[in-house]
Curated annotation (Swiss-Prot):
The record marks 16, 20, 52, 75, 116, 120, 150, 173, 294, 298, 326, 349 as: Interaction with RNA. The modification Phosphothreonine is found at residue 215. The N-terminal RRM domains are responsible for recognizing the G-tract of BCL-X RNA. It comes from the Eukaryota. It holds the Pfam family zf-RNPHF. Component of the heterogeneous nuclear ribonucleoprotein (hnRNP) complexes which provide the substrate for the processing events that pre-mRNAs undergo before becoming functional, translatable mRNAs in the cytoplasm. Plays a role in the regulation of alternative splicing events. Binds G-rich sequences in pre-mRNAs and keeps target RNA in an unfolded state. The modification N-acetylmethionine is found at residues 1-2. Residues 11-90, 111-188, 289-366 form the RRM domain. This is Heterogeneous nuclear ribonucleoprotein F. CDD domains: RRM1_hnRNPH_hnRNPH2_hnRNPF, RRM2_hnRNPH_hnRNPH2_hnRNPF, RRM3_hnRNPH_CRSF1_like. The gene is Hnrnpf. It is found in: Nucleus, Nucleoplasm. It comes from Mus musculus. GO terms for cellular component: catalytic step 2 spliceosome; cytosol; nucleoplasm; synapse.
Length: 415
């Protein structure tokens, strides 16, 4: 094991902005002036929860001089991409590699995947046929429903083994009927999050399956925040309002899509009235650990957002849709823990394409595990002062995020 100047932290740099097709050889060529520790074994790509390259990598080097040479490569190009180079350390590298990728410590190996984009009228037989050759456990398909008891167009499928679930991910973007189906890694915990008791919902007329986006009859999945003073408590309430076990339900999903091909029924389930000072309606969170994004490019997709926060693994992304049926440039991103939400704040004012993104924290420490958080947060670039301001060292996490919305007096009020 190589020893560094800080008690075994080694000589590590992190690269960001790598092309998706980047290879170890490409990294070696980019850092040709540096000596990489253990050669090819010293390059560690970071993967998304779907098993794809995230565009980031850690590289172990031989000496402090090699680190200095690597840092001089910051903002130089690899192909058509310019690469950012940051100084890192072994603690950050080990933590990130452990908590990223499809086989991360954060991913329960229970054989679940999540489907999104199921077509109108999709039946249980079609889901089984979609995964033909992959064994699904008895009663292994869960169909979430919206507050009115209607199927949402998503499904959870549990396979007989984790290996089969990994194979199922290979069906991503294949078709059922005329619809491309997205397949994501999931867990039993995520399935359970859909079974929590629903809050009191606002009655809004649901459209028929062929209504166009932007019409007055569009179904808006907004909820009244029960027992909270708007958003000032800093904690969303959990639950999407029950789920329906696999029992042959095949009701109409009422899907429609926006200009970018996203399912409005899904996007709108995460929409809230964005007149922040006046509205009592907020998006529900399944975890209570949320980061709000502002300034997104209008063509930004959920994958863009997942990649933006990489190597962190958001639980869910809600892209906001305005009353006119168009994206607003804002989104809510849920994380599994308070520590991950705080770590995500290190990306505040970072760029997505040509836009810099503002982030606002809305999370509480109730479900956090702080034993490792201070070291990890600093490794992720979050200062102790920011962590304190964000609630890691404070018992009071109310008001700032909500106040920033209510009066728009704060551009970045963290909890």
């Amino acid at each position: 094991m190589m020893l560094g100047p800080e008690g075994g932290e080694g000589y590590v740099v992190k690269l960001r902005g790598l092309p998706w097709s980047c290879s170890i050889e490409d990294v070696q060529n980019f850092l040709s002036d540096c000596t990489i520790h253990d050669g090819v074994a010293g390059v560690h790509f970071i993967y998304t929860r779907e098993g794809r390259q995230s565009g980031e990598a850690f590289v172990e080097l031989e000496s402090e001089d090699d680190v200095k040479l690597a840092l001089k490569k910051d903002r130089e190009s690899m192909g058509h991409r310019y690469i950012e180079v940051f100084k890192s350390h072994r603690t950050e590298m080990d933590w990130v590699l452990k908590h990223s990728g499809p086989n991360s410590a954060d991913s329960a190996n229970d054989g679940f995947v999540r489907l999104r984009g199921l077509p109108f009228g999709c039946t249980k037989e079609e889901i089984v046929q979609f995964f033909s050759g992959l064994e699904i456990v008895p009663n292994g398909i869960t169909l979430p429903v919206d507050p009115e008891g209607k199927i949402t167009g998503e499904a959870f499928v549990q396979f007989a083994s984790q290996e089969l679930a990994e194979k199922a991910l290979g069906k991503h973007k294949e078709r059922i009927g005329h619809r491309y189906i997205e397949v994501f890694k999931s867990s039993q915990e995520e399935v359970r999050s859909y079974s929590d008791p629903p809050l009191k919902f606002m009655s809004v007329q649901r459209p028929g399956p062929y209504d166009r986006p932007g019409t007055a009859r569009r179904y808006i999945g907004i909820v009244k925040q029960a027992g909270l003073d708007r958003m000032r408590s800093g904690a969303y309430s959990a639950g999407y309002g029950g789920y329906e076990e696999y029992s042959g339900l095949s009701d109409g999903y009422g899907f429609t899509t926006d200009l970018f091909g996203r399912d409005l029924s899904y996007c709108l389930s995460g929409m809230y009235d964005h007149r922040y000072g006046d509205s009592e309606f907020t998006v529900q969170s399944t975890t209570g650990h949320c980061v709000h994004m502002r300034g997104l490019p209008y063509k930004a997709t959920e994958n863009d957002i997942y990649n933006f926060f990489s190597p962190l693994n958001p639980v869910r992304v809600h892209i906001e849709i305005g009353p006119d049926g168009r994206v607003t440039g804002e989104a809510d991103v849920e994380f599994a823990t308070h520590e991950e939400a705080v770590a995500a704040m290190s990306k505040d004012r970072a760029n997505m394409q040509h836009r810099y993104i503002e982030l606002f924290l809305n999370s509480t420490t109730g479900a956090s595990n702080g034993a490792y958080s201070s070291q990890v947060m600093q490794g992720m670039g979050v200062s102790a002062a920011q962590a304190t301001y964000s609630g890691l060292e404070s018992q009071s996490v109310s008001g700032c995020y909500g106040a920033g919305y209510s009066g728009q007096n704060s551009m970045g009020g963290y909890d």
